Amino acid sequence: MTFNHKKMEPKWQQYWSEHNTFKTTEDKNKDNFYALDMFPYPSGAGLHVGHPEGYTATDILSRMKRMQGKNVLHPIGWDAFGLPAEQYAIDTGNDPEEFTALNIANFTRQIKSLGFSYDWDREINTTDPEYYKWTQWIFEKLYEKGLAYEAEIAVNWCPALGTVLANEEVIDGKSERGGFPVFRKPMRQWMLKITAYADRLLDDLDLVDWPENIKDMQRNWIGRSEGAEVTFKIKDSDETFNVFTTRPDTLFGATYTVFAPEHELIEKITTPEQKEAVEAYKKQVELKSELERTDLAKDKTGVFTGAYAINPINGEEVPIWIADYVLIQYGTGAIMAVPAHDERDFEFAQQFGLNIRPVLEGGDVTKEAFTGDGPHINSDFLNGLAKAEAITAAIDWLEKEGIGSRKITYRLRDWLFSRQRYWGEPIPVIHWEDGETTLVPEDELPLLLPKATEIKPSGTGESPLANLHDWVNVTDKNGRKGRRETNTMPQWAGSSWYFLRYIDPNNSEAIADKEKLAEWLPVDVYIGGAEHAVLHLLYARFWHKFLYDIGVVPTKEPFQKLFNQGMILGENNEKMSKSRGNVVNPDEVVEKYGADTLRLYEMFMGPLEASIAWNENGLEGARKFLDRIWRLLVTEEGTLAEKVTTDANANLEKAYHHMVKTVTNHYENLRFNTGISQLMIFINEAYKQDTIPKQYVEGFVQLLSPIAPHLAEELWEILGHTETISYVAWPTYDETKLVEDEVEIVLQVNGKVKSKITVAKSLEKEELEKIAQEDNKMKENLEGKTIRKVIVVPGKLVNIVAN
């Protein structure tokens, strides 16, 4: 006997919708709980089975917290700007807005079919002008505080496509689409000064309950380094340049220096005989992406400029080279090379026959770089010193001589905040003919994205907005002509603050009401993929800290607890993808097995954080368990089974209280697979009984409801209730019912186990000894022997020594 999920699930989804069951309560006498999913990009492909894993986890927590008497904020929305919609528009001539709306409608249908308890009244969409008005407002505040600025930045320019490409869209120097040549070209871009927040982004990781590996990824991305900035003079010139080094104590071993090919001094210092080689090398580098340039495994390339620098610590002349592995945007765009103690410098020196001088004792630098620690050698006043002392002494000397100073640098770069795209938030800036740049007045926000009948590349590297002359060209009241900014914001913009808008989604006066922000922040639990470890999570923390500084939000950090669900792989253990043909569509699973089965299966596959292969047999097993529950509790006619009575049943008492305690604890700690195991154990016990107390059945159904809400609502109705199960007080357990009143005793002869018995826990020593001697197996083993001694350890064992 089985239940009909095709009838039952739509019935309860309609009930929840009509009764607005999951509308966020804002009762001042209750605690608040904010459970957040990383909102999806509504792609044309729709949901895949990986999406519901994280969504089910937050839904279980949300449903449990409502039953535990909390106000629960559990919202959903759409991160709907982005490249795929624009690409679709360029390829088909269709409107990205219409395409996006269709995708959102499909995602909404799919999400509702899975029974998630979202408050749909709070739905947001990053492409809605009432939403992006506030994204633009935040940009304006950043600009006013000097944290948004323009800079010339090298981008991936594809002349054939007439557009700028992201690093991911470039493969081996060619565009992913069409295979056209791509060049590095400096272009005017908007930048956000995230580096101003580097220390706080680092230090405040201590305030949050996040996986340590994610914290480490952010720490490494920010990459705080302490060291010194050292000034080198160029021989026979007034020019100087600076390098940053974490090891100023190795300056005596610096035997050459390397510039990034884009360094501004190269043209000035290159000698006539090296000019041609330098120009050719620079052209070659233009075709390479940053990843290709810094690949440690590749052969080192470079070219000598013909110029020399003076090593400031010993006055030696050292050659100046250029090489692609030095990037202009990192540090100063120039490095001092100490080949004896750095692997990359060593390989470069070997390739080009440059001098290698050891300054630390240890290793054999004729064979490989020595990267360990040792006392200093060949280093004049630093000789004999260990690393820490030598660094301090070197910096002190540099500062005294006025040729260097202590410095902290970061690997973190400022955030490149503009895209040469149409489908994004317009940047609310006007460039005037007299050179002034102004913001669009706050009372004129949102600056609307104009409708375009055809989206096509501008051909100049600007976004397609540059083609819309009526929109771009403006005149102020004094007749001064200007051009609107044609770059748009990146997709990361809308997702950097969306969790704030859910708190007060219809506020037209502010991002959200201050009092409401104080009540709901920080987010209690945020669940999503680990792939967002550095970009989204770092950008959101940056914007949140900025909004904290200007008094908009009351907390330093946005997300108190973060959890990353694992990936659901294809049946062959490979990542699911269209090209592999192993993508599982949740619609098909819901049709065949039901949403409750899908939810149960995804939570029971294994630990939430593990990556696990999809398995059809596992789905069938999940459905069988739900059918087992149904058969136990419901008759063929659909009424409550006769074995469910109001009578007590001592045999089930301990199992029930143990289940309530364990399941509650495991749900709280996101250990859903082991929580479900406890539900299964209880059902196995219940099948062995002639009667099951109705109170226990109700408690069980409540514990089941966050996982399988449709089935739970149906069972709750069959149990005689007319209201939804969603707000019924969560079951409690009695600790005294968990105490064992019986205990297993091991019986031994001469220290070897011969038998085991179960006895009352309260049994005295003498009683235990008597029972042990009367045990049949013990009698067999003691036959013909004389008992010399009896050792009794109450609650554990009886050992009879005999010979």
UniProtKB/Swiss-Prot annotation:
Residue positions binding ATP: K578
Catalytically driven reaction(s): tRNA(Leu) + L-leucine + ATP = L-leucyl-tRNA(Leu) + AMP + diphosphate
One Gene Ontology term, aspect cellular component: cytosol
Annotated EC: 6.1.1.4
Family: Belongs to the class-I aminoacyl-tRNA synthetase family.
HAMAP family, alphabetized: Leu_tRNA_synth_B
Protein name as catalogued: Leucine--tRNA ligase
Organism encoding this protein: Listeria monocytogenes serotype 4b (strain CLIP80459)
Name of the coding gene: leuS
